[in-house]
Amino acid sequence: MITVEDIQIKVYQLLKEKLKAVKLTGSVGYTRHDFTKEDVIILSKGSEGSSDLCVGSIVVNIHVPDIKSKKKDGSILYDINFPRLMEIRTATIEALNSYYNAEEGYNWVISHLDPATKEQDQDEHFFPVYLEIYIRHNK
């Protein structure tokens, strides 16, 4: 029986391959290690349902460091790197929407997107992309 965690691995493999073109300064993975680099982090949120159909969710967070600049008074200012966030988010959405395999007993849809959010205690912003997972169990 396939689980959301198994599908999380498929999402990882897909994004690892498809996001090569955007040349992340960090990586595609499951946890953050270096907040000074761009990362795409995949988090499983579990599933619930019957023996025939389970619904689960995965969140793909796109992290991009803010742009550092100096103000005239010499103080440091951090601004959202919105163009880069959008570039990586667009490539991520295209990759996720490109995948479909009816033979494996599951599928996903992008259920919603949140706006860019400031990462608490870090000089970066992130975009979450929410996947709703449908797992069909054949008897």
Positions of predicted regions on the chain:
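A short, hydrophobic beta-strand-centered structural micro-motif
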Residues: 35-45
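Charged, amphipathic alpha-helical segments and their flanking helix caps
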Residues: 1-24, 44-139
